[in-house]
């Protein structure tokens, strides 16, 4: 049975960049764990803001967060109130100084993490899984995705036996290194159990060493 390598790990250093950018000899394990906790905290705090990516950079004890979001207004707040509150909460919890940069995602329909979370939300609201998959696939294609593949795994429609269903439209060349493949994963917590949602979106081919 063929196994699939993670599309980001497969392309790291070639046309994908690391989402944590720093180096430390002595504190490496502590920083990795702290990065995980920072992402978890920010994701929980801004769960309604459509966060697709949280990048972390470190320099001289200061942490810089780069948040890619579909709703920058919610993250920043009126006159920057929300972003200041987030910075204060992070400083209090992690005892570090934080700088926060917010980038707007212009086309959330072709951002795989947001697409996966959208499908998961629909499943939690008891929308039929096939309808949720087909709706998001057609929307992604409409907004310029060259190909998209969606899989849902678990007790679909409340079935006794868990299974995996998938739907694909267009090309999704996972083994082509120069292909710009975006990958997202989300979980739908339904009354029957957890349903895993995976989304691969092919956005086109990149030139040699061009970073997506």
UniProtKB/Swiss-Prot annotation:
Residues 38-106 form the KH type-2 domain. GO terms for cellular component: cytosolic small ribosomal subunit. The keyword Ribosomal protein applies. Pfam families: KH_2, Ribosomal_S3_C. GO terms for biological process: translation. Transmembrane segments: none annotated. The keyword rRNA-binding applies. One of its GO terms (molecular function) is structural constituent of ribosome. SUPFAM superfamilies: Prokaryotic type KH domain (KH-domain type II) (SSF54814), Ribosomal protein S3 C-terminal domain (SSF54821). Disulfide bonds: none annotated. Keywords: Ribonucleoprotein, Ribosomal protein, RNA-binding, rRNA-binding. Binds the lower part of the 30S subunit head. Binds mRNA in the 70S ribosome, positioning it for translation. NCBIfam families: rpsC_bact. Part of the 30S ribosomal subunit. Forms a tight complex with proteins S10 and S14. Belongs to the universal ribosomal protein uS3 family. This is Small ribosomal subunit protein uS3. The lineage of its organism: Bacteria, Pseudomonadati, Thermodesulfobacteriota, Desulfovibrionia, Desulfovibrionales.
